[in-house]
């Protein structure tokens, strides 16, 4: 018997049919450690159990991760200060690789290791944990399924990596961080993103259907392995979670390892080997029905969240009334024409309108300056204000002699100014015109990059 093998047999309904058999001593120790560590991780890592709130997630406060970690955070801070000599805090940045999470994992490892030693000393006569392992595997399978559905719907409804913003099109490639490259590469092809998400959603659904759980584990393992590699190579701050999701897949595969080996080597695979917590035909059916309802509950929540995100900042979001990239052709300040000198810190090169109530000024040195924007289409008035400013940067009237021309006239930074801008034809950008499927291509299309 393999060290990690849980020797069991089940009938076609998933019920145990063989009497309990002794486990390998090393296997018992590894189970105790895995039970403690992965059980604690699923409970204390703030993202694992929140999925089960389903549609109620929309009602949770924005600082729910801090509230979730309120129990473990004092311990984590103490360990960080005492053991690692650093003061850690939970930042609401969306990063899953903050120091506070790494120290949390360290604490869980220490607790699991100490608990394993104590458990082994107090439970030396126990020869197997078949019943307990059945409930443990069910618990982590549900947790894994929730994560697969959550991340899957975020891509299937393409909002996790939205289409590159207009300012992204103006940013030099060398200024991109690796994560920006990955996000833009996926976001430029919503179909590709949706297919990635569909695979993850399918993995989550298969995990929750009793007869397809093994297929769900295998599909989830492939998906999470790819995600983890991308996170590691593009420095995406979800390395810790994606690695643990991949480990959960491997833990779920442990009981099925002999069957998979037999199948891959052309031998009879036999019945499912994963122990089941339900013993009667009736409870098995009730459990299967409950898992189907869980699919509906979780999916409803994530479809709702995805639809809201799609309308808020995805492809279905509202655009600015003056949407587009506007290039300055004439710039007059205090009645004097201002030449387009790269050293001029006050002259504009471009003005970008993308999201409502936002504008971005591109200076002559190509620096991008985000601003708040109030556009009154009735009065043809544009007010711009910096993020930290207490007074308006610009109060300008505007007119459009033609759809592709914009004339601003008013006060800019306390000076009278008149600015004439022409709208950039986004169709001229290879990233926009080169999209789509081309079955016939005489040459590779690298846009303007290769010259």
For the regions a protein language model found, what residue spans apply to each?
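Individual transmembrane alpha-helix segments
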Residues: 80-111, 189-198
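Interfacial segments of alpha-helical transmembrane regions
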Residues: 126-151
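Alpha-helical transmembrane segments of multi-pass membrane proteins
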Residues: 38-54
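Internal/C-terminal transmembrane anchor helices
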Residues: 137, 142-146, 277-311
